[in-house]
């Protein structure tokens, strides 16, 4: 299979084809996901919770992401690889340039940043320097202490309008993908329709251009809490490879996420 490019992902949006994404942190699972046909792998700062055992993503460092990105890239030959810029690693444009370069040298195809309008200067600078950027709006886990917990965002009209405006500003600044997390289905639909770039949802309903899950949630192996928006695909299949195939099939056929996995 040919290497997935951002232009291929954009074409999938234009053709109304669903994009399938999953987090990955090591070579073994990256190979399974890649061979199954997952188009995008995210080396997420979620590793702080599912691998390191923290109660948030805040302790994760750039070196953590660099290490796991290199592991994923070693076996994922077709999937498009996105690496998270972790908490406080992009507070200024200059910091974002330096830390994004580290992740790109590790093999990432794109870096992801959480935040709205305040990121536009950094996004422009990164793109000018040849580094593709994925945005992340809605529930941004690095801001959990501002939100007062992991809560659905955009239910109030004013905040919904602000999120839509942020998405448009980030697109204008140069992001080529957007992750939209834990927002009502109606808002996700508005943002997905308004943007030319692909929108990847997690807890955002089935109207986005694609879906992403934390792999530990998708296999039901997360310690403790399992989010409402997730589903244990391993429970239905009993086999990891079959579970990945089921996830792909249900995303492509719009069976997942269903109403029970969505917010209104």
From Swiss-Prot:
Recorded metabolic or biological pathway in which this protein acts: Cofactor biosynthesis; (R)-pantothenate biosynthesis; (R)-pantoate from 3-methyl-2-oxobutanoate: step 1/2
Positions bound to 3-methyl-2-oxobutanoate: 45-46, 84, 112
Principal location class: cytoplasm
Active site, renumbered: 181 (proton acceptor)
Location relative to the cell: Cytoplasm
Gene Ontology biological process terms from the UniProt entry: pantothenate biosynthetic process
Enzyme nomenclature, EC number: 2.1.2.11
Reactions catalysed according to its record: 3-methyl-2-oxobutanoate + (6R)-5,10-methylene-5,6,7,8-tetrahydrofolate + H2O = 2-dehydropantoate + (6S)-5,6,7,8-tetrahydrofolate
Keyword set includes Membrane: no
Cofactor descriptive note: Binds 1 Mg(2+) ion per subunit.
Family annotation (CDD domains): KPHMT-like (cd06557)
Annotated InterPro entries: Pantoate_hydroxy_MeTrfase, Pyrv/PenolPyrv_kinase-like_dom, Pyrv_kinase-like_dom_sf
Annotated coiled-coil segments of the chain: none
Annotated family: Belongs to the PanB family.
Function: Catalyzes the reversible reaction in which hydroxymethyl group from 5,10-methylenetetrahydrofolate is transferred onto alpha-ketoisovalerate to form ketopantoate.
Protein name per Swiss-Prot or TrEMBL: 3-methyl-2-oxobutanoate hydroxymethyltransferase
